[in-house]
Amino acid sequence: MTVSKKVEENIFASKLGPEYVGFDHITWYVGNAKQAASYYVTRMGFKQIAYRGPETGSRSVVSHVISNGQAIFVLTSPIRSMAGTGAYDDDPDVTKADRRLLEEIHNHLIKHGDGVKDVAFRIEGDIEAVWKRAVDHGAAPVAAPTTLKDDRHGSITLATIGTYEDTVHSLINRHDYSGPFLPGYEVVTDDDPINRLLPSIDFIEIDHCVGNQPWNGVDPIVKYYEDCLNFHRYWTVDDLNMCGEYSAMRSIVVASPNEVIKMPMNEPAQGKKKSQIEEFVNYYNGAGVQHIAFRTHDIVTAVTRLRERGVSFLEVPSAYYSDLRQRLSHTGLTLEEDIAVLEKLHILVDFDEKGYLLQIFSKHVLDRPTVFIEVIQRNNFDGFGAGNFKSLFEAFEREQARRGNL
C-alpha cells in the first residue's frame, strides 16, 4: 500500500457565462435496452420515466428512459438488424432517417460494445448561438438546432455536436417543456415492483462525466472544449501524483463557464505496465466515457443500500484508513461520518482545510472493462479526490491483474 501524501492540484477561476444548467441526460447505445435499463433499476434504484418503441411509432429503435433524482439515463437499442446491402430499401416502415440511425447504432456496437453515445447538456439560453459558436470553432455539426413540440407538454429546442471519437453532446433547452423527457416518448408512471422490495437509493444528480483519451489525447480535446464550448480548465494534477506501483495517467478537468458542468479528461502516462486508461482504450477501441459520478447527500446510506442491491465496488486495504486517521489527526478537520464505517464500506476520503469529499467506485458495469460508476458526496470540497489517486490506482491494478491486463 502506498501512503498518500498531500497532492498538489490546481483549481482555476471560473468565467462568466450562465447559460449552462447542468447535465441533461446520458444516452447509451446497448445491445438490449430493456435488460440494460433493468440493471440500473434493480441495482441502483432508478425508475423508468419514458419509453420510445414500436408502440409509440418508432419502428426500428427502442429507448428506455430511467432516472434517479436529476440523473437520467437513456438506454437505446436497434430492434432491426443491418444484414445485407441496401437493407430495408423497400420497407415502408423504415425511413431514411431510421436507416441512418440503425447504421450508426450498429456500427457503434460493433466498434465499442455497449457504451455512452451522448452526454447531453441542459442550456437555459440560446441553443442556436451555442451550437453556431461550437461549429464555427471546429465542432462537427451532428444535428442543427430544431424545435420539437407535443400538444400536452409544450416545446423543446435541441441540437447536437460531435466531441471525442464517436461521442456527442446534445444541447437542450427545456424552458418551455413540462414533459419528463422529449416529445415522441411515452410517459411511464408505473414503477418496477422490485423497487418496493429493495431499499431506495437517493442520487441528486450527475456530478461529473469522465472521458478517457488515447496517448497524448488530452490537450487536443481540452482545446476543443475551450474553443468550441467556452469551457475552461478547472482542475489539473500531474502524472507523478496519479499513479500506482505500475501505471500512471494524466488528467485535466474542463468546466462550463459557470462551472455547473465538469468533464474530467484522462490519458495514459508512462509507467512500468499498462494503465487502466490504456486498458479502456484497447477494449473500447478508442476514446469514450469511462465513468459517470452520481452525487448524493448521504454516501454511507447510499453505498450500504447499493451493496444490499448487489452492486460490487473496488476494495481498499485497511492501511489506507490507518493513514487517513493519522493525517486527520494533524488537522482541525472532523468528519461527520465514522471512519470505521467508511472503512467497512471501502469509501475513500479526500480533504483540505475547508472541507472533504467522500467517494467510491464500482467495478465495471459491463463485461468489457470499460465503464463504471462513481458515487460521491461533497462537503464544501470542489476537487476530484487527488489524494486518493494512488490508492485508487492500486485498486484498479489489482483488478487489471486478475483480468491478465496489467
Swiss-Prot record:
EC number: 1.13.11.27
Cofactor binding notes: Binds 1 Fe cation per subunit.
Reaction it catalyzes: 3-(4-hydroxyphenyl)pyruvate + O2 = homogentisate + CO2
Domain of life: Eukaryota
Record keywords: Dioxygenase, Iron, Metal-binding, Oxidoreductase, Phenylalanine catabolism, Repeat, Tyrosine catabolism
Cofactor(s) required for function per UniProt: Fe cation
Pathway: Amino-acid degradation; L-phenylalanine degradation; acetoacetate and fumarate from L-phenylalanine: step 3/6
Gene3D superfamilies: 2,3-Dihydroxybiphenyl 1,2-Dioxygenase, domain 1
Residue ranges occupied by any VOC domain in the UniProt entry: 22-174, 205-363
Pfam families linked to this entry: Glyoxalase (PF00903)
Matching InterPro entries: 4OHPhenylPyrv_dOase, 4OHPhenylPyrv_dOase_C, 4OHPhenylPyrv_dOase_N, Glyas_Bleomycin-R_OHBP_Dase, Glyas_Fos-R_dOase_dom, VOC
Positions of transmembrane segments: none
Any GO BP: L-phenylalanine catabolic process
GO molecular function, one term: 4-hydroxyphenylpyruvate dioxygenase activity
Enzyme class: oxidoreductase
Cystine pairs: none
Residue positions binding Fe cation: 208, 291, 374
Similarity remark: Belongs to the 4HPPD family.
Xref: NCBIfam families: 4HPPD
Name listed for the protein in its UniProt record: Probable 4-hydroxyphenylpyruvate dioxygenase 2
Organism: Aspergillus fumigatus (strain ATCC MYA-4609 / CBS 101355 / FGSC A1100 / Af293)
